[in-house]
């Protein structure tokens, strides 16, 4: 008989097998983008300072940005948050509201010591398959390095969105399917 715990365990084994298969055939990093020299390292105090540079204002589960240039700072699985998730302004997978025509500077930080992640922007909304095929509009970060030696990986990119609804998604197999995504409304 399956209990909720055994079903969850079996599901994660399936996701893990899918990720291993994807990596074996070269899909894991190809789906998330390439690991490149744009990734830098930061210590925990540096990460905390970066998180403070987000220019949004929180209201409920929404972070609203204003102005011609906005700075979104997103982290993967900050301490105290469930795996897998993104955090912006201490909110799990919040909706981001951004003015149309703004220049959006994104800093993405991976603080999850067990996994790499990606932060990609797409028009395709949920639900997402274990092996998501989302055709990113912005293949934002590529595949992040796994943090080690007390240092975390981060990278920056710039986006110039037009009005519409978008989603930020982690393309690592199984992550978006288990909730590692959020909505972006540009208006």
Curated annotation (Swiss-Prot):
Superkingdom of origin: Bacteria
InterPro entries: BlueCu_1, BlueCu_1_BS, Cu_oxidase_CS, Cupredoxin, Rusticyanin
Pfam families: Copper-bind
Residues noted as binding Cu cation in the record, renumbered to the chain: 117, 170, 175, 180
Bound cofactor: record note: Binds 1 copper ion per subunit.
Signal peptide (from-to): 1-32
Subcellular location: Periplasm
Domain Plastocyanin-like span(s) in chain numbering: 85-187
GO cellular component, one term: periplasmic space
Paired cysteines (S-S): none
Cofactor: Cu cation
UniProt GO molecular function: copper ion binding; electron transfer activity
Keyword tags: Copper, Electron transport, Metal-binding, Periplasm, Signal, Transport
Induction entry: Expressed during growth on Fe(2+), sulfur and thiosulfate.
Protein purpose: Electron carrier from cytochrome c552 to the A-type oxidase.
Record-linked NCBIfam families: rusti_cyanin
Subunit structure: Monomer.
Protein name as it appears in the record: Rusticyanin
Natural source organism: Acidithiobacillus ferridurans
Lineage: Bacteria, Pseudomonadati, Pseudomonadota, Acidithiobacillia, Acidithiobacillales
Name of the encoding gene: rus
């Amino acid at each position: 008989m399956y209990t909720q715990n055994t079903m969850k365990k079996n599901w994660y084994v399936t996701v893990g097998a899918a990720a291993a298969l994807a990596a074996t055939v070269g899909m894991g990093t190809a789906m998330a983008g390439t690991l490149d020299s744009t990734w830098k390292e930061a210590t925990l105090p540096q990460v905390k300072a970066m998180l403070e540079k987000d220019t949004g204002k929180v209201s409920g589960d929404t972070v609203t940005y204003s102005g011609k240039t906005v700075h979104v700072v997103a982290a993967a699985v900050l301490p105290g948050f469930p795996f897998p998730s993104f955090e912006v302004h201490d909110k799990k997978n919040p909706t981001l509201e951004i003015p149309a025509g703004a220049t959006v500077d994104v800093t993405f930080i991976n603080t999850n010591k067990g996994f790499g992640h990606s932060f990609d922007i797409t028009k395709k909304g949920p639900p997402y398959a274990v092996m998501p095929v989302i055709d990113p509009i912005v293949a934002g970060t590529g595949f992040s390095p796994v943090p080690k030696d007390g240092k975390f990986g981060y990278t920056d990119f710039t986006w110039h969105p037009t009005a519409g609804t978008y989603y930020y998604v982690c393309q690592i197999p199984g992550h978006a399917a288990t909730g590692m995504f959020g909505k972006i409304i540009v208006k």
